[in-house]
Regions:
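Phosphate-binding site of ATP-dependent enzymes
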Residues: 177-264, 285-292
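A glycine- and small-aliphatic-rich helix-loop capping segment at beta-alpha/alpha-beta transitions
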Residues: 96-105, 181, 186, 314-316
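Active-site "cap" helix and flanking loop/linker of ATP-utilizing ligase/carboxylase catalytic domains
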Residues: 227-279, 307-341
Length: 341
């Protein structure tokens, strides 16, 4: 399932195409399902799947594709391989709908997906679990509108500069800004409020940004971690997913003991957040040796160039093999559930 309503729908299309291309056809009969901008589902032919953008696909849905009412989805598929990203795709909304329909799906469940999308709630859980996280101040829109000067003073005193400003519930570095002085706070916060009613201001970490995939259900295992090398101070969506943008080094250029520490922290975060199937944990190897957890990505990009496939290859898995394991984890989770679903 690909497309959707979020700012990441073009990446979702790339993920869906790649999953469709790389899935093991000896075991599975893939059905490309596209979610349009009104959240309607369509079974699309390959010629539409290969279009350049979601807009190009939507132009010919009525003539070329077959609508799939949600209530009949279970008659068409045995498991949904989620290629959706961002709001309404990886925030628990689609997961909840699939639970109601009784259809197995890849990735984490409703609550874990919702928590993973909310950076502040996620960070609080990780902190309570004893993990290192960046110092963070949450700013609700209502407080910003009535106490702007107090908020700016609190940022200067508790966080300092440079700092990072971001929407609380958006993925892939949407509207994330590095602010180097007090003069830049207002513009960055106002911009972030275009995306969410809750904005986070956090400390700007120094060291090496790393990311580590984790797969599994009851016994999760960490893949080989990667060093992420941004084209700017903050990783963009293009850095994370698209061809020729940004750079990853797998494995990360760190001592073996530091690599193992990163893998251990990734699994610990995966467990603390009750993630399932697969996820990518973004972290920072601080200059003092500590590993700070930034956030999880509960439905990592599955584009051909995504870092998750680099890590799988370094761990001895092909793209087809990783996709197969992710689907099997989905079936395992579904089989372990109790009740009518």
């Amino acid at each position: 399932m690909m497309g959707g309503l979020s700012s990441e729908k073009e990446v979702s299309l790339e993920s869906g195409r790649n999953i469709f291309s790389k899935i093991d056809r000896r075991k599975y009969d893939p059905v490309p399902i596209f979610m349009d901008s009104r959240a309607a589902l369509w079974e699309i032919p390959v010629k539409l799947l290969m279009r350049n953008s979601t807009r190009d696909i939507e132009e010919d849905l009525e003539e070329e594709a077959k609508p799939i009412p949600y209530e009949t989805l279970k008659e068409r598929v045995d498991v949904v391989c989620l290629g959706l990203h961002g709001k309404y795709g990886e925030d628990g909304c689609m997961q909840g709908l699939l639970e109601l329909l009784g259809i197995p799906y890849t990735g984490s469940g409703v609550l874990a997906s919702a928590i993973g999308m909310d950076k502040y709630v996620c960070r609080r859980i990780l902190e309570i679990s004893g993990m290192d996280v960046p110092r963070t101040i949450p700013i609700p829109r209502s407080r910003w509108e009535t106490e702007k000067s107090c908020v700016k003073q609190e940022v200067a005193q508790r966080i300092g500069f440079p700092c990072v400003v971001k929407p609380c519930r958006e993925g892939c570095s949407t509207a994330v800004k590095k602010v180097v002085s007090a003069e830049g706070i207002s513009d960055a916060v106002e911009n972030a409020f275009h995306w969410d009613n809750l904005v986070l201001v956090e400390e700007f970490l120094t060291g090496m940004e790393v990311t580590c995939g984790v797969i599994g259900v009851d016994a999760p295992e960490a893949l080989v971690p990667s060093e992420t090398i941004p084209t700017d101070d903050v990783l963009s969506l293009q850095d994370k997913f698209l061809y020729g943008q940004g750079e990853n080094k797998t494995p990360a250029r760190l001592p073996a003991e530091q690599i193992e520490k990163i893998r251990e922290n990734a699994v610990k975060a995966f467990r603390a957040l009750n993630l399932k199937g697969y996820a990518r944990i973004d972290m920072f190897a601080r200059n003092d040796g500590r590993i700070a957890i930034l956030e999880p990505n509960t439905l990592p990009g599955m584009t051909p160039s995504t870092v998750l496939f680099h890590q799988a290859a370094a761990s001895g898995m092909t793209q087809t093999g990783l996709i197969d394991r992710i689907i099997q984890f989905a079936l395992e989770v579904h089989a372990g559930k109790r009740g009518p679903l």
